[in-house]
From Swiss-Prot:
Monomer. Interacts (via C-terminus) with RAP94 (via N-terminus). Interacts with the cap-specific mRNA (nucleoside-2'-O-)-methyltransferase. This is Nucleoside triphosphatase I. PANTHER family: SNF2/RAD54 HELICASE FAMILY. Residues 456-523 are annotated as: Binding to the cap-specific mRNA (nucleoside-2'-O-)-methyltransferase. It catalyses: a ribonucleoside 5'-triphosphate + H2O = a ribonucleoside 5'-diphosphate + phosphate + H(+). InterPro entries: Helicase_ATP-bd, Helicase_C-like, NPHI_C, P-loop_NTPase, SNF2-like_sf, SNF2_N. It is found in: Virion. Residues 355-531 form the Helicase C-terminal domain. The gene is NPH1. GO terms for cellular component: virion component. GO terms for biological process: DNA-templated transcription. It is an enzyme of class 3 (hydrolase). DNA-dependent ATPase required for providing the needed energy to achieve the termination of early transcripts. Acts in concert with the RAP94 subunit of the virion RNA polymerase and the capping enzyme/VTF to catalyze release of UUUUUNU-containing nascent RNA from the elongation complex. NPH-I must bind ssDNA in order to exhibit ATPase activity. One of its GO terms (molecular function) is ribonucleoside triphosphate phosphatase activity.
Amino acid sequence: MNLHAAYIDYALRRSQHMQAEMSGADNVLLKDYQLFVAKVFLGLDSMNSLLLFQETGVGKTVTAVYMLKHLRFLYTSWTVLVLVKKALVEEPWMNTILRFAPEVAKDCVFMNYDDQNFHNKFFTNIKTVSARSRIFVIIDECHNFISKSLSREDGRARNTKHVYNFLARHIASSHNKLLCLSATPIVNNVREFALLVNLLRPGVLPPQSLFHNKRLLDEAELVSKLGCICSYLVHHEASIFEDVEGSELFARKRVLLKYVRMSAKQEDIYHKARAAEFRSGIAVFRVHRRMAATFAFDEFPVRKNLTPDEYDALVASLVRDFEALFAGRALSDATRARLRAGEPIECAASAEDLSLYQALYEHSCKYAEVCVAILASPGKCLVFEPFINLSGIRIFVKYLEVFGISYIEFSSRTKDTRTRAVAEFNRVENTNGELIKTCVFSLSGNEGISFLSINDIFILDMTWNEASLKQIIGRAIRLHSHANNPPERRYVNVHFVVAQLGSGAPSVDDDLLEIIQNKAREFSQLYRVLKLASIEWIHQHCREFAPVDDEAGFRALCSRAIDVTRGASTRRALATGENIWYAFSTLMITVHPGFKTEDGRVYDADGNFLTTMPERPIVRVQGTRLVYIFPELR
């Protein structure tokens, strides 16, 4: 990697005239890490692509705009194509450009990759690009673009894949540039890593699997051939299920699993939802169970023999019945005051209020318990609920009203008002939630926005992957996001709210937690590759190089094919030792059977080597089990 380091050194020398201040209608002083990335990417003309793998809140947009402002350092004529979700065009992109680099606005063409007609608009715009102009492409939240480029289940290519193929073929040619931005570049499966790499470095990654028994075949080969593929700035490398200590820049994170038992009515509806999924053949998606584990109407709405309009009318009537049942009802001021003081509901509530609470709990153990926890929180709260209508946010806000909790909503229902509402929520005067206590948000709010001074986040329903959950949590733990809080309140408690069945059988929430953890094991290995191949890691750790005076060999260095044909060798042997239990997190979401040999080697149940037992292992007790914790295996 020393040769990569030599080219980074060359880029920094060539771009040393670039200053940290960026001025337009407003001024901003770039952080050292932002200026470093810009100097390297613009200092190497033949560095055609770069991934900004940087966590939320560190200024990826500002870094990208700074690059646009200094493009003429390389060449006089550029066309800038910004591929972005529609919700993020005005804020942060256009706002940042107009504040700090208004002169480049005329060169920028914004296209929304979440537009159904995106591919046609893209190729229409490409045809208008002058032959004399170079192209600078920015893909914001590139994991979304990549996921839209994956083939469908039936093997048919999506329209976005045509845009992907064009970029892979043409951007790496000549002297065009491609900048991809993401805090979570891999979201759903490892195929996304292959697509991302072959977009940034076309043709270097072979079609063979990179894994054997969920372990990377050759980390060193990947790191060597992918040198300088990205900028890596991730302060919180730990799993979302691990606690993270705070720093001067970031708040402390503590993770809590909040188990709540379904009422008899909710559990009955849950089992009906499960049966309906299996009858209709959609059990794999778990949609009905997820909704029932969150909220249950008086009856389960069955689609059978109903037209779509009839089914919608049935659900609407159930919603109206629920809203009518609790219309005008609210907990007393005295009960709310005791709940804010931290008293349990059984002690805090009068007989009338307790009856009201139990009626709410009967429909949703999650909603009722979370409202109690919000009142007890000393600061502001976020509540994530992906479902909006039916039994989702529309119902949850009724719970907030009964509990007397002030709130804003950030979802597709509030497109016209949500940006202003977040600004009010983030005001210094509302640091402790005096004006607005809670923000309820859907997946609309997991990218591109910041929430300040949050003390508690409640995850009411699991997503299918850790990356989405990281984005959600990252909305509240950002650079200087808790600067207005006193030191003792610079923390964020993340509550994963898990519905439990009375029988003790795993619920849909338990299933999703296990799926998330299994995916995360492979993702974390690929993230480590990106870290070790990043320009920051190479610049800091590879110092034994001879300076270069040009970049003639850089493109060839980055075009070498990756060889993963060596595969994984397997050797059979008889070992003596003992059976053990192990987990990847102290939360022990999933506990696995394993085997420890007499010399301390640890294997999984299939005999695959995992790790060597440390001298002072982390051990936890779960029921009658002694469980070893191996967080490094994630």
